Design a protein with these regions (language model features):
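Alpha-helical transmembrane segments and their helix-start/interface "positive-inside/aromatic belt" motifs
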Residues: 21-22, 59-71, 236, 240
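Interfacial loop-to-helix junctions that mark the boundaries of transmembrane helices
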Residues: 33-37, 62-66, 106-113, 230-232
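Juxtamembrane/interface alpha-helical elements of multi-pass membrane proteins
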Residues: 66-182
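Membrane-helix interface segments
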Residues: 38, 59-60, 148-150
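Hydrophobic transmembrane alpha-helix segments characteristic of membrane transport
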Residues: 44-51, 137-141
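Transmembrane alpha-helix interface motif
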Residues: 1-38, 46-51, 165-254
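Alpha-helical transmembrane segments and their membrane-interface exit regions
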Residues: 48-57, 71-76
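Helix-loop interface residues and adjacent transmembrane-helix termini in multi-pass membrane transporters
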Residues: 15, 35, 57, 132, ...
């Protein structure tokens, strides 16, 4: 079982109405992106952290570790905005290298800060949803919102095959490592190609078996999964509305 999936099953917010969590995550994500505000992004980051770690019971160390993944990509991506090579030094910093300067501007630094804050806060919205809601509940909420059945079915199948292929991939990796299949770059490439071809063949076999199993159970184009019904509560809806209102006010006043 994947880490995020395991944490979602253990979350204290798992049995909160999935449609409420989905709408909160989507609305907060939209506000965070549209506002282009560092204050709104910081507030979203803090609120989602409190909800996920404080209310959901997700371990803080795991949450921070998950946030480090997008943070690494953000740092690498925003480096091009901050760092410039020019013959003219800019107003933020300048490192002289002969006739050239490795330099940056205050405007570039602020733009990078805004971009990182917005992107990282947007990721926390998705983490809130994925760490506190199991996949079947998310798909059920999407169906209630009249999301196309074809897309929800594809999402469920892709989700299913991640688990189907993850275990064989792990076993193949361990087997290759035991046989020194990654001792240098050439053998790593060869081992990766062999694993890819083996997984491709396995995926075809498993997909045919899965389709035969669904056909034997009167598959009509829609995949139906039993979900535990959790009624929406007025108090939870009021909290969501209050949070969104606060974010809008911070956006307008900021």
């Amino acid at each position: 079982m994947l880490l995020i999936d395991k944490l979602s099953y253990r979350s204290k917010l798992r049995y909160v109405n999935a449609s409420e969590k989905l709408m909160y995550a989507v609305l907060t994500l939209i506000l965070c992106i549209l506002s282009h505000s560092v204050r709104v992004a910081a507030l979203v980051f803090v609120i989602n952290g409190i909800l996920t770690v404080g209310k959901g019971g997700i371990p803080l160390s795991r949450y921070i570790r998950l946030l480090m993944i997008p943070t690494a990509f953000l740092i690498a991506g925003t480096a091009a905005i901050v760092i410039n090579i020019s013959k003219v030094p800019m107003d933020a910093f300048a490192l002289e290298l002969g006739e050239w300067y490795i330099t940056g501007s205050v405007e570039g630094l602020y733009l990078a800060l805004e971009l990182c804050a917005t992107a990282l806060s947007s990721v926390t919205c998705l983490y809130f949803l994925s760490l506190n809601t199991v996949m079947t509940d998310i798909l059920d909420a999407l169906r209630k919102l009249h999301f196309p059945a074809l897309l929800t079915g594809l999402m469920l199948l892709v989700y299913r095959f991640i688990f189907v292929l993850f275990q064989p991939a792990s076993a193949i990796t361990v087997s290759q490592q035991a046989r020194l299949g990654n001792r240098d770059f050439k053998t790593r490439v060869r081992s990766f190609g062999a694993m890819g071809s083996a997984l491709f063949i396995l995926a075809l076999k498993r997909s045919n078996m899965l389709y035969d199993a669904m056909e034997s159970r009167c598959y009509d184009g829609n995949i139906r999964v039993l979900t535990r019904m959790q009624p929406a509560r007025a108090g939870e809806i009021a909290v969501i509305a209050a949070i969104e209102l606060i974010l809008v006010l911070v956006w307008i006043c900021g």
